[in-house]
Each structure stands twice: as C-alpha cells, then as structure tokens.
C-alpha cells in the first residue's frame, strides 16, 4: 500500500499495483494527447476508486460548490508524481 499527501493536503492510499492497469494507462494517454477532457474523470476513478475520488472532490470543491477541472488535474498529477517517487524508494520484497 502506498500512502501519500498532495501539496494541498489531500491524503490518499493506493495499492502497490495501481499503475499496473492498462485502462488507467489508456486514460492517462488520452489526457496527455490533449484528447477528450472527460478522460480526467476516468483517470481519477481508476486511480483512486469511488470513495477517495469523492473525498478528493470535496477537498478541492470551491465555496460555490463546484469542482474545478484544473484543480483536479493538478491533484492527480501530484498523486502520480508521489506514486513514482515512493515506487523508486521502495524496497523489493524477498522472493
């Protein structure tokens, strides 16, 4: 289990094999290519699951009740960077 916190203070947990999901990779590639903007919602769901996605929405929700896509993109990028950093620092388990 990988645990982390974004720059804005959102605390999350990801399974070690979260990135080992071709559907997530496809959705991330679609975002990266400037493709369909709805891919961000799919990336968030595949990365965090329903409960954590709801918590993240509430975390970045504005006073008028909206969840800004720009803020969501920044949070997701921060989570993915954190996942990569923890992955580099993890110790492989003995076989």
Q: Model regions: which residues?
A:
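Short, surface-exposed, charged amphipathic helix/loop patches that serve as local interaction elements
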Residues: 7-10, 15-95
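Short acidic, Pro/Gly- and aromatic-enriched capping/linker segments at domain boundaries
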Residues: 1-5
């Amino acid at each position: 289990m990988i645990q982390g916190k974004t720059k804005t203070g959102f605390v999350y947990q990801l399974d070690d094999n979260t990135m080992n999901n071709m559907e997530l990779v496809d959705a991330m590639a679609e975002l990266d290519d400037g493709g369909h903007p709805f891919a961000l919602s799919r990336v968030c769901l595949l990365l965090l699951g329903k409960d954590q996605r709801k918590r993240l929405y509430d975390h970045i929700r504005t006073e008028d009740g909206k969840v800004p896509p720009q803020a969501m993109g920044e949070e997701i990028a921060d989570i993915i960077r954190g996942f990569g950093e923890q992955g580099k620092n993890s110790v492989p388990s003995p076989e």
